Amino acid sequence: MKVRQAVVMVGGKGTRLMPLTETKPKPILSVVDKPCIWYLIRSLARAGIEEVILACGYKPGMMEERCDGSDLGIRIRYAYEDEPMGTAGAMKLLEDQLDDTFVASNGDVFADIDVAEEIGVHQDTDAKITIALTPVDNPCEFGIARVDASGRISEFKEKPKPEEVFSNLINAGVYVLQKEVLSRVPPNQFFDFSKDLVPIILSEGGRVQGYSLSGIWMDVGRPYDLLGANLAMAKREHIRDHRAEDACIRGDFYMGPGSKVANSELISSVVLAGSKVENSRLERALVMRNCKVDGARIINSILGDGCIVKHGAEVLNAVLADNTVVESGQRIDEGRRV
């Protein structure tokens, strides 16, 4: 049976990404000039999903403005929470609008993945819930799963302490569900999918299946994760632009539409649409939209939209909020967020 619906939870404020999320919700932060969530929606569209419901909370108007699905041929609807209800609680609010089988995903991850394959695993195993899993080096910030030889999840623990870790396979936040599991979610109550609902289904003997994720997945929880996602897509899509004038470019690199790079050295850096970089050195830098950098050094740093960095300035290991001005000769460093 065709799976045609997906719910994407995009209600969080993205506090770990401050100051970048002071002015916009996390899912629309740019990854090579597309909203981060666009790649997930593209993955859903490629899997045959026809309708996506975005469960919005923080700055919903901006979500509507940047995510209409028209360029992907997919219908997007918006649902709104008056107060945070948790991931499972948000799905419960939509219960009467959902098909018997649907996809659900956290909207705060960067995911360019094979959702169709996960749907196939779910249907082949007759699971109640299928969870995309991926290995990480430090699983303590995530939910972890123990799986048997068939991929069935036998044990699941949310954000374990170091001494409690029994697996490096973590919940990647992309699920296929049978709607019937939402009957276990109490109405009008904060209820988390991983912490609350999954343990209930496991305790009842319901099949919770693990799926080994295929594609690129990143938790974009912190600013430097956003830089990593931009560099990963620049590399994967082989995005190169030769409009740079008298520039030395090394490593993965991207220039957005209307951007300009001249008389500069760029190492593993991303310059988004409308930004101008001249007479400067960038290394592992993300220069977001409509910035101006002239005669400066930007190292291991992120400039929010509309930033201006003047001659002789240095931005080292820092994250600048939208429209920050760094004056000539000024130095911003040591992990500061401005």
Which residues does each PLM region occupy?
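A phosphate-binding catalytic loop at a beta-strand-loop-alpha-helix junction
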Residues: 4-20
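Conserved N-terminal catalytic core of the sugar/cofactor nucleotidyltransferase
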Residues: 1-8, 30-117, 321, 329-338
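Extended, small-residue-rich solenoid/repeat segments and analogous flexible loops
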Residues: 188-189, 202-292
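A short, conserved acidic/glycine-rich loop-to-beta-strand motif
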Residues: 125-135
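Catalytic-core segments of class I nucleotidyltransferases/pyrophosphorylases
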Residues: 102-103, 110, 119-123, 137-139, ...
